[in-house]
């Protein structure tokens, strides 16, 4: 309303000025109408699903592909493009597009790739993103990572294919699980960060286990406006794409409603599920509070903290609960400052009553984000100390 009144006054004064000067000079010619920018992409949004299905998730990929097509049925493919990069164990690697055919929605191949480069190689990720943006340019972009995930922990892979008789089945580290050439290969999150262009995606959605960790989120903070991820495991069925795609395939993606659909899908079945939506533009206020919490860092007891991992992963604890325990020994730390920052940063979060181990999740201590217990020495600590999050909040300790 204030803007309207301001412009109304401006127009009135301009009219009075022109009337007063009309006897001196002729009125200026009207400004020509702006012409459309021929460089403006015709599509409103292109969403890329980067799917590594060359592993035990292949049957889930087929199911999710059908869901994605169902989600695109009411969407104009001339204005909104859904692209899926997928790799199978057979070595069949291609970029597909959801298109309208005489038989209904289906995927058609728009580019094929060689299978000598693993899909967990950051060079392939960069190549596919560049292809997607060149082949289907749009005014905005979204990105789904579809595969296995395990937070920040590295594999240290050189992404070199090995003969089948040399394949070693490692733990699921970071992102991927490409078994195209016999070795189960993974992409570390610093590699992922180097492969992703800055300030390109409206959102990144990790449809993988454990990727809602502060280490992953902070490493990718400059890659998108928003992020959706799960601090715990997620069932291999993943997101209900028939509901999610229509909500995110529009100029203003409704990520909160899409996350709610995902949570409700599992919660109604009384299955474990956690999810969070983050506004990445608000993350530095969180890191400021955490830097203060760690200014007088000492190891803390973690046995009674809420834990989101199981088996040999992590352990990954609730981020806020861990930070407050560490910060209790720092005179610079203010819990209220952290709570305010988190309220702006995590714009939606939800958790089921129990986790995947059958233990209750305390909603009062559920932040939607996990964290590593800093300086609990493991074989991966050297790598952990190289991550942006550690450097940001530990003051070089």
Please report, for each region that a protein language model flagged, where it lies by residue.
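Bacterial N-terminal signal peptides that target proteins for export
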Residues: 1-9
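Bacterial Sec-dependent N-terminal signal peptides
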Residues: 1, 15-43, 373
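Loop/turn elements at helix/coil->beta-strand transitions in domains of secreted/extracellular proteins
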Residues: 43-46, 76-82, 136-142, 198-203, ...
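Acidic/histidine-rich, surface-exposed loop or edge segments in extracytoplasmic proteins
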Residues: 43-55, 105-114
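N-terminal carbohydrate-binding/catalytic regions of secreted carbohydrate-active enzymes
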Residues: 57-91
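Short, solvent-exposed loop/turn elements at domain surfaces
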Residues: 55-59, 92-93, 378-383
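Terminal, contiguous helix-loop blocks that mediate binding/assembly
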Residues: 32-33, 158-161, 167-397
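Catalytic-core segments of thiol-dependent peptidases
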Residues: 86-109, 117-198, 208-209, 214-215, ...
């Amino acid at each position: 309303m204030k803007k309207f009144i301001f412009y109304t006054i401006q127009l009135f004064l301009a009219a009075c000025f022109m009337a007063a000067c009309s006897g001196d000079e002729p009125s200026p010619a009207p400004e020509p109408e702006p012409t459309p920018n021929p460089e403006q992409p015709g599509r409103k949004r292109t969403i890329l699903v980067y799917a590594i299905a060359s592993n035990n998730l292949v049957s889930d990929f087929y199911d999710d592909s059908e869901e994605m097509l169902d989600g695109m049925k009411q969407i104009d493919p001339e204005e909104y493009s859904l692209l899926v990069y997928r790799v199978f164990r057979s070595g069949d690697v291609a970029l597909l597009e959801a298109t309208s055919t005489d038989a209904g929605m289906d995927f058609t191949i728009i580019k094929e790739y060689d299978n000598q480069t693993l899909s967990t190689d950051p060079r392939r990720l960069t190549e596919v993103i560049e292809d997607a943006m060149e082949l289907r340019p749009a005014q905005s972009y979204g990105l789904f990572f579809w595969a296995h995930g395990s937070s920040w922990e590295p594999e240290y892979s050189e992404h070199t294919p090995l003969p089948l008789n040399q394949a070693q089945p490692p733990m699921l580290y970071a992102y991927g699980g490409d078994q195209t050439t016999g070795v189960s290969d993974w992409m570390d999150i610093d590699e992922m960060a180097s492969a992703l262009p800055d300030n390109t995606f409206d959102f990144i959605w990790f449809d993988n286990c454990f990727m809602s960790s502060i280490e992953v989120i902070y490493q990718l903070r400059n890659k998108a406006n928003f992020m959706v991820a799960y601090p715990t495991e997620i069932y291999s069925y993943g997101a209900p794409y028939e509901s999610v795609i229509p909500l995110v395939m529009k100029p203003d993606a409704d990520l909160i409603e899409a996350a709610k659909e995902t949570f409700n899908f599992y919660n109604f079945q009384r299955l474990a599920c956690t999810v969070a939506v983050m506004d990445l533009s608000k993350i530095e206020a969180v890191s400021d509070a955490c830097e203060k919490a760690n200014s007088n860092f000492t190891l803390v007891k973690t046995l009674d903290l809420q834990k989101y991992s199981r088996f040999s992963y992590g352990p990954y604890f609730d981020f806020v609960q861990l930070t407050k325990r560490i910060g209790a020994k720092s005179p610079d730390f203010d819990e209220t400052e952290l709570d305010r920052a988190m309220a702006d940063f995590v714009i939606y979060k939800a958790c089921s009553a129990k986790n995947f181990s059958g233990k209750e999740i305390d909603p009062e201590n559920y932040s939607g984000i996990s964290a590593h217990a800093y300086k609990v020495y493991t074989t991966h600590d050297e790598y952990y100390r190289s991550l942006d999050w550690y450097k940001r909040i530990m003051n070089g300790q």
